[in-house]
Amino acid sequence: MQAARVDYIAPWWVVWLHSVPHVGLRLQPVNSTFSPGDESYQESLLFLGLVAAVCLGLNLIFLVAYLVCACHCRRDDAVQTKQHHSCCITWTAVVAGLICCAAVGVGFYGNSETNDGAYQLMYSLDDANHTFSGIDALVSGTTQKMKVDLEQHLARLSEIFAARGDYLQTLKFIQQMAGSVVVQLSGLPVWREVTMELTKLSDQTGYVEYYRWLSYLLLFILDLVICLIACLGLAKRSKCLLASMLCCGALSLLLSWASLAADGSAAVATSDFCVAPDTFILNVTEGQISTEVTRYYLYCSQSGSSPFQQTLTTFQRALTTMQIQVAGLLQFAVPLFSTAEEDLLAIQLLLNSSESSLHQLTAMVDCRGLHKDYLDALAGICYDGLQGLLYLGLFSFLAALAFSTMICAGPRAWKHFTTRNRDYDDIDDDDPFNPQAWRMAAHSPPRGQLHSFCSYSSGLGSQTSLQPPAQTISNAPVSEYMNQAMLFGRNPRYENVPLIGRASPPPTYSPSMRATYLSVADEHLRHYGNQFPA
């Protein structure tokens, strides 16, 4: 069984975290031995949380300084173009989003590991509680049989064997053996208080773990939602989404540093326990259970003897002696006193049941079962649980870094959106290729019919009247296209023949549109040339 004890070895991260300096609030060194009830030890853990709070303050100071510089300092456009500015914002957002997604992935893994470790601890505590409760039940049940049930049968047999002194001596001897068994069983430790403490610890662990797991899950969802808002804000160039991202990012930044403080303090405290768990358990159970019994279960050494060996051996010998005496009475006394058979058979059945309880008790008080539960609990705390806390701490740090980057990129994106809107405002509204003019024309009614080619054949006889009147510059190109469409097809619709009235192609004139435009123009020239010859 010595090999089972070697199975637990404090991992390297436990030693590394335990080596973190423990300093009190007065900046004095504190003993790193795990003692949660000690006020100085509690101050050392609180000091670690204050270190994270100081880091949060420095982070906020840096962000405020950067935001002030970004809002009041003007950048030279000759040195860095707008296109480069937009590209820089995009890549900053991409990097921040990737860091945030990586942080959430690490956080999910750490949250799952911590949850597994906590539930493994709870299962081990429940198994140990089941063993302790079984020991107490067997001891109390056997004591009840020896003190009450056996006494009743012996009292009736004493009345039956009143005329035989030798049989009365045998009954008295059986009664002495039963008293010896009761005395030996009373020497076994009572685990009732230990069971209550372990049950309370298991319930508290489950309660805290449930809300811890749920809180981190909500924090992961919040971080992903903030990343989504940031992507939508940059894609739609929405200042409202950008402002929401900045506010939520600041909140998540505070939560990230707070979770880092909690994870760091919890990880250091757990490592202090995992370095020497036996010492802490011996100190806690010193007033409830003997040190010999505690060491027997903690170390379970094959070379050491069980503290219950003498008690169990005496119990077994007493049962064997009583069974021999009862068998002798059944053989010699029943032929003379037939009324004693029922009580003797009942005593024999009671002794057989007590022997079965003895075997169960021997198996339960053996150190191997409880020592396995102890090792499983240590594995849940010091391996899965502590690893999960480290991953959660890494998540908190990466999330703080990602949201700090997002907050830094926010003012630059805001200024870029403002500059882009200002550039749109500087464009001439009469420009037919202005995107704003196209949007305004699509939502406004037509401004009136323009002169079409039909108005040029109005019946004036002079040759000069055949020339089309000068086309006025219109700031509603959509209406002009619709009027020309009504001329040729009677239905107002958009055509692929732009700017017919102006007789000039747009700058982005495709070959197909050019061919269509030239064919229509030639047809119109031939038509009007035949009707109005020079």
UniProtKB/Swiss-Prot annotation:
Segments carrying motif RGD: 164-166
Chain positions found as Phosphoserine: S504
Residues spanned by motif PY-motif: 506-509
Entry GO CC: chloride channel complex; plasma membrane
Post-translation changes: N- Glycosylated. Contains high-mannose, hybrid and complex oligosaccharides. Ubiquitinated by NEDD4L, leading to its proteasomal degradation.
Topological domains annotated Cytoplasmic: 66-87, 235-240, 410-534
Chain positions found as Phosphothreonine: T199
Subcellular location, principal: membrane
Sugar-modified residues: N31, N129, N283, N352
Its job: Calcium-independent, swelling-dependent volume-regulated anion channel (VRAC-swell) which plays a pivotal role in the process of regulatory volume decrease (RVD) in the brain through the efflux of anions like chloride and organic osmolytes like glutamate. Probable large-conductance Ca(2+)-activated chloride channel.
Protein's name according to its UniProt entry: Protein tweety homolog 2
Taxonomic placement: Eukaryota, Metazoa, Chordata, Craniata, Vertebrata
